[in-house]
């Protein structure tokens, strides 16, 4: 495949190869990123990209769908088995599309959404004013207490005051486990539906390394990449037949047209990988590696939001530091460690600067790095932050980590 690309567009070929080198030589520690399975990439690059298939299996608007019907049906059945649920829609192009489809299916314009505050770890689609959800619906938020944990008592009070039609439990930057049972109790108290957004922790959920959203959530949304290591895409799950029918209509024709059949095939491939025993071993490694990293950083007197982590990510707190999340992001990037600046609870700086960084363990765990490597990485992160303007140190660390990274190739052959 790469041969044809090199011949037809050498510029793009070279840029992809450049990115291939970057991913191999740098330590990818952005919590939402991961290395997908090589088999998933093969499916993504297949001839299925040529086929339009508006509708659903055996209910298409186009002819010639007999093969892609089998592909999508397989993806649906594997998703249902993986998440132990009765209904699955695999057509959502992304996690944001999945969430918007849920709202479109279950809410009316200007209904009320209660989701986690963006600065406390929520996602744009959980009701942020700048997003579609914040414009088409009335959005309200809950947050975390001084300890960095979700304050369920305060969340109940907010829900009783707001009386939302839907409550969203999920996050993009919360280092602790979600208590779905408590959220369902809150939802029942105010007569709301409960949406569990497990985009970040889906891989941990299916490996029994995080609480399961069912039977507590009425509907569950997720991405298929991140901790699942599948292709970029979205997924919606439920055990309610009526909700499932509404979701299907909300995806097509409500918010999308033709599904991406190559992506759906890749999702099916990813789900099969997730069902293997080896994936449980991987998920355990993701958590144990993050525990080691948190331990090292705390021993080096670095402050962490909620004083640690229970999942695949942690947040470093720079509220009382002279440097910002942006400064740390740049310094660590210079040292070959890719993280992202992130707002944190009690944020005082702009979202473009921030007072924190988010660090994840999923991608490096996929490369086979273990607790030994994460201890080294933790010490290097500490060294960089303690002397944040020392460019020569950053370059020295970059070379050290590049040598370590070379022992853990992303892919064992140049697939790109």
Curated annotation (Swiss-Prot):
Give the organism's phylogenetic lineage: Bacteria, Pseudomonadati, Campylobacterota, Epsilonproteobacteria, Campylobacterales
Q: Provide a GO biological process annotation.
A: glycine biosynthetic process from serine
Q: Which organism is it from?
A: Helicobacter acinonychis (strain Sheeba)
Family recorded in the similarity comment: Belongs to the SHMT family.
EC supergroup of this enzyme:
transferase
User: What is the name of the protein in this document?
Assistant: Serine hydroxymethyltransferase
Q: What is its main location?
A: cytoplasm
Q: Which key words are in the record?
A: Amino-acid biosynthesis, Cytoplasm, One-carbon metabolism, Pyridoxal phosphate, Transferase
Q: Where is this site: Plays an important role in substrate specificity?
A: 225
Q: What is its EC number?
A: 2.1.2.1
Q: Which prosthetic group or cofactor does it need? A: pyridoxal 5'-phosphate
Catalytic activity, per the record?
Answer: (6R)-5,10-methylene-5,6,7,8-tetrahydrofolate + glycine + H2O = (6S)-5,6,7,8-tetrahydrofolate + L-serine
Q: Which Pfam families match?
A: SHMT (PF00464)
On subunit structure and binding partners, the annotation says: Homodimer.
Could you tell me which residues carry N6-(pyridoxal phosphate)lysine? 226
Known CDD domains for this protein? SHMT
Q: Which residues are listed for (6S)-5,6,7,8-tetrahydrofolate binding in this entry?
A: 118, 122-124, 242, 350-352
Q: Name one GO molecular function term.
A: glycine hydroxymethyltransferase activity
Which terms in the GO cellular component ontology are assigned?
A: cytosol
- Subcellular localization, as worded in the UniProt entry: Cytoplasm
Q: What does the record give as its pathway? A: One-carbon metabolism; tetrahydrofolate interconversion; Amino-acid biosynthesis; glycine biosynthesis; glycine from L-serine: step 1/1
Describe the function of this protein.
Catalyzes the reversible interconversion of serine and glycine with tetrahydrofolate (THF) serving as the one-carbon carrier. This reaction serves as the major source of one-carbon groups required for the biosynthesis of purines, thymidylate, methionine, and other important biomolecules. Also exhibits THF-independent aldolase activity toward beta-hydroxyamino acids, producing glycine and aldehydes, via a retro-aldol mechanism.
Q: InterPro entries, from UniProt?
A: PyrdxlP-dep_Trfase (IPR015424), PyrdxlP-dep_Trfase_major (IPR015421), PyrdxlP-dep_Trfase_small (IPR015422), Ser_HO-MeTrfase (IPR001085), Ser_HO-MeTrfase-like (IPR049943), Ser_HO-MeTrfase_PLP_BS (IPR019798), SHMT-like_dom (IPR039429)
């Amino acid at each position: 495949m790469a041969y044809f690309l090199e011949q037809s567009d050498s510029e793009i070929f070279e840029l992809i190869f450049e990115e291939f080198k970057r991913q191999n030589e740098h330590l990818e520690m952005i919590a939402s990123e991961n290395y997908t399975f090589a088999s998933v990439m093969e499916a993504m690059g297949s001839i299925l990209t040529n086929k339009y298939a508006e509708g659903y299996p055996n209910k298409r608007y186009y002819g010639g769908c007999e093969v892609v019907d089998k592909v999508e049906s397989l993806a649906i059945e594997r998703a249902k088995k993986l998440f132990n649920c009765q209904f699955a829609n695999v057509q959502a192009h992304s996690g944001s599309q999945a969430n918007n489809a849920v709202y479109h299916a279950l809410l009316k314009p200007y209904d009320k959404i209660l989701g986690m505050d963006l600065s406390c770890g929520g996602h744009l689609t959980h009701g942020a004013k700048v997003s579609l959800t914040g414009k088409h619906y009335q959005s309200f938020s809950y947050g975390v207490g001084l300890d960095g944990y979700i304050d369920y008592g305060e969340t109940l009070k907010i829900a009783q005051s707001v009386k939302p039609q839907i409550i969203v439990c999920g996050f993009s930057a919360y280092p602790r486990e979600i208590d779905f049972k408590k959220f369902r109790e809150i939802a029942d108290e105010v007569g709301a539906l409960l949406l569990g957004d497990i985009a970040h922790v889906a891989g941990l959920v299916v490996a029994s390394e995080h609480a399961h959203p069912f039977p507590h959530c009425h509907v569950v949304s997720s991405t298929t990449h991140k901790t699942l290591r599948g292709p970029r895409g979205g997924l919606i799950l439920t055990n309610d037949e009526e909700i499932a029918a509404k979701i299907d209509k909300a995806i097509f024709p409500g918010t999308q047209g033709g599904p991406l059949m190559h992506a759906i095939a890749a999702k099916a491939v990813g789900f099969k990988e997730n069902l293997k025993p080896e994936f449980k071993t991987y998920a355990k490694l993701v958590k144990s590696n993050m525990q080691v990293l948190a331990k090292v950083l705390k021993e080096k007197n670095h402050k962490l939001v909620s004083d640690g982590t229970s999942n695949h990510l942690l947040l470093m707190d720079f509220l009382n530091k002279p440097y910002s999340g942006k400064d740390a992001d740049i310094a660590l990037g210079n040292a070959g460690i890719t993280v992202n600046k992130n707002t944190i609870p009690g944020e005082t700086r702009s979202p473009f600067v921030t007072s924190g960084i988010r660090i994840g363990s999923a991608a490096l765990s996929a490369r086979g790095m273990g607790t030994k490597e994460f201890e080294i990485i933790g010490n290097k992160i500490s060294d960089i932050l303690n002397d944040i303007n020392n460019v020569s140190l950053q370059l020295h660390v970059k070379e050290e980590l590049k040598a370590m990274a070379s022992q853990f190739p992303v892919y064992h052959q140049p697939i790109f």
